[in-house]
């Protein structure tokens, strides 16, 4: 009969501190205790980088409801805290219902616009093909890209949730889609390092911007220079950002400003995506732009009172500038939210970075910083991205127009 080796049993039960220290010692050489309940000065064992060691340790700690993080000191200090879970992921049928509802709203909004600009054919069929479909496909692409990046980083985030309005409102929101939300709160997620956070957060705004800009230009090329035959009310004039305006002025000459008053639904879809991508890049708590700023500056520097005061003053300055120079209500609402969230009770915190010891590689830091600035500058929509054309019927005698 085969003999089994006896199992060594400790004479006393380990405390929780000793248990965590023993688990950490599999991947780190654990030194003296640091300040904090479960914290030690550590060094990654031979064959492990700090990134590998903290990732493997967190795989072990996940079952215990704990998460470990490394601070930027040299040697780093390992701190273990309770894992924050937040809300769960929506079931597939609920998520599908929200997407279906938003797509229907897009079809209605695009159909109304297609009818107002005199597009031939059924307006809702034109809307489905040239407005709802391009927007939905781009949003799905951005959502899937972010979901895969999150999954690669060990984060279960699910797909994004879009919200859209059923009409193009010149006063409240003239772009149809007005919201794109994540299912999981950022402050309840744990990202391995600052570079990974920047990569995840820039994925959606960059996708919307890079797809939306050429889509807007193609839609502008498809727009006729002559007005709709049944123009009975003031046209809604859109104002594009720098890149498409520059290219369209070279390709269409001076007609591009006229075409913006009855732009093709495909152009409106591209403009809507570009505007949404630009808004998501703004450094407002809760938006990807603020989390990208946290990745670039570092969480500790980002949440410092000095940094928060500077951001608040900038937000307040923008709010005053918008109030004085623009009558575009959405900008006023967004600037107000930016000020309120910066120091409000419901301030949204950026994700927890579990490995601050490696910092942000300089080359990658410059690349992501440049990308963020480029999107903000090239996508700048101006104080009034859309406005009703004043005195559109000046010099015309409506009494001579045929009536139905």
Where are these regions (language model features)?
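Hydrophobic transmembrane alpha-helices and their immediate loop junctions
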Residues: 1-404
């Amino acid at each position: 009969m085969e003999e089994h080796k006896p199992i060594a049993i400790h004479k006393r039960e380990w405390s929780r501190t000793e248990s965590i220290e023993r688990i950490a010692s599999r991947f780190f050489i654990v030194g003296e205790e640091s300040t904090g309940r479960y914290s030690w000065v550590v060094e990654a064992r031979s064959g492990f980088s700090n990134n590998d060691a903290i990732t493997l340790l967190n795989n072990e700690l996940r079952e215990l409801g704990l998460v470990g993080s490394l601070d930027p000191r040299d040697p780093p200090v390992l701190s273990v805290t309770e894992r924050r879970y937040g809300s769960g992921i929506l079931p597939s049928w609920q998520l599908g219902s929200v997407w279906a509802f938003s797509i229907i709203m897009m079809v209605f909004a695009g159909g109304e616009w297609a009818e107002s600009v005199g597009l031939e054919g059924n307006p809702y069929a034109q809307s489905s093909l040239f407005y709802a479909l391009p927007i939905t496909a781009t949003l799905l692409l951005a959502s899937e890209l972010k979901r895969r990046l999150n999954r690669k980083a060990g984060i279960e985030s699910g797909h994004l949730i879009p919200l859209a309005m059923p009409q193009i409102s010149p006063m409240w929101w003239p772009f149809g889609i007005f919201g794109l939300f994540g299912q999981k709160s950022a402050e309840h997620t744990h990202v391995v390092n600052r570079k990974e956070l920047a990569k995840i957060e820039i994925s959606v705004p960059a996708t919307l911007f890079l797809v939306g800009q050429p889509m807007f230009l193609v839609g502008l090329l498809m727009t006729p220079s002559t007005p709709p035959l049944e123009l009975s009310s003031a046209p809604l004039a859109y104002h594009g950002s720098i890149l498409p305006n520059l290219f369209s002025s070279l390709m269409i000459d001076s007609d591009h400003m006229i075409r913006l008053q009855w732009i093709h639904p495909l152009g409106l879809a591209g403009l809507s995506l570009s505007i949404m991508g630009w808004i998501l890049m703004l450094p407002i708590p809760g938006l990807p732009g603020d989390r990208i700023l946290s990745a670039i500056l570092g969480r500790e520097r980002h949440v410092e009172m000095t940094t928060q005061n500077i951001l608040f003053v900038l937000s307040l300055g923008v709010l005053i500038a918008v109030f004085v120079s623009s009558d575009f209500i959405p900008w006023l609402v967004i600037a107000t939210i930016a000020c309120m969230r910066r120091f409000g009770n419901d301030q949204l915190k950026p994700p927890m970075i579990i490995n601050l010891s490696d910092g942000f590689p300089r080359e990658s830091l410059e690349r992501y910083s440049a990308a963020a600035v480029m999107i903000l500058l090239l996508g700048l929509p101006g104080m009034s991205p859309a406005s009703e054309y004043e005195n559109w019927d000046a010099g015309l005698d409506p009494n001579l127009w045929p009536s139905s």
